């Protein structure tokens, strides 16, 4: 899809660009919570964040949004291989995000598209998450649902729980997505705007927008996918070395850092 917005003032996938996006959206829509939407809602913009690799970058985005008086939802995995939501550091970060007024949810891959199994697995993860974080959870998002589209087509509803892919916030299409669906879904997955850029809303008839943002894709400097992953890997390595240094008193952190930087 072609775009009509001007990105010359901010690097792609930089926090500056995200500020521009939020500013423009705020001028056109009420950016509200999933819980504020019902069948009678005529226009809305909801924004969510699925946390894949970086809890730290999620906090940076949460702070940015809070500065602009925008509240969104952050969905965490409890069995992610790249971060532990229950480490003391990450627990503090998740609490900081919640204290900023954002909602917290569960991000998971159900083992089946059967509603009974989805329900059971969600409530299991909800119990674990709430017991360890002391944060109440009332929502979930599916991880990589494109690999099992049936879980989207079923429009799974659980009383008292928000499924961000329910038909109140999301339209499922078996075939080609129409140019102007009733609910416009926008995602930055794989560092691409395959369904259009949020600023395309400036020249559209969209009245309902659901935006998925992955915080790990965004940074102060921005850049392409390759540059982003290089910077992300460096951040992860730095965090690992800091953690080892905290745990092992005789860890030669200065020598390791010199070797790492010279490589």
Annotate each PLM feature.
Residues 1-73, 77-89, 98-100, 111, ...:
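Terminal accessory/targeting
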């Amino acid at each position: 899809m072609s775009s009509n917005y001007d990105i010359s003032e901010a690097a792609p996938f930089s926090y500056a660009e995200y500020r521009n996006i939020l500013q423009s959206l705020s001028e056109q829509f009420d950016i509200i919570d999933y819980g504020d939407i019902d069948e009678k809602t005529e226009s809305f913009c909801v924004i969510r964040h699925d946390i894949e690799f970086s809890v730290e970058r999620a906090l940076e985005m949460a702070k940015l949004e809070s500065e602009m008086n925008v509240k969104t939802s952050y969905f965490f995995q409890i069995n992610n291989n790249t971060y532990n939501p229950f480490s003391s550091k990450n627990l503090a970060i998740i609490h900081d995000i919640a204290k900023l007024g954002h909602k917290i949810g569960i991000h998971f891959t159900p083992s089946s598209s059967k509603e009974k199994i989805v329900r059971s697995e969600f409530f299991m993860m909800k119990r674990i998450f709430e017991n360890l974080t002391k944060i109440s959870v009332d929502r979930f998002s599916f991880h990589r649902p494109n690999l099992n589209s049936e879980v989207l087509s079923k429009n799974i509803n659980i009383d008292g729980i928000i499924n961000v892919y329910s038909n109140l916030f999301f339209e499922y299409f078996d075939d080609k997505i129409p140019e102007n669906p009733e609910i416009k879904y926008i995602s930055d997955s794989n560092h691409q705007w395959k369904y259009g850029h949020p600023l395309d809303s400036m020249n559209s008839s969209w009245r309902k927008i659901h935006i998925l943002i992955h915080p790990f894709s965004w940074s102060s400097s921005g850049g392409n996918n390759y540059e982003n992953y290089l910077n992300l890997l460096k951040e992860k390595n730095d965090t690992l070395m800091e953690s080892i240094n905290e745990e092992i008193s005789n860890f030669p952190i200065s020598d390791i850092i010199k070797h790492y930087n010279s490589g």
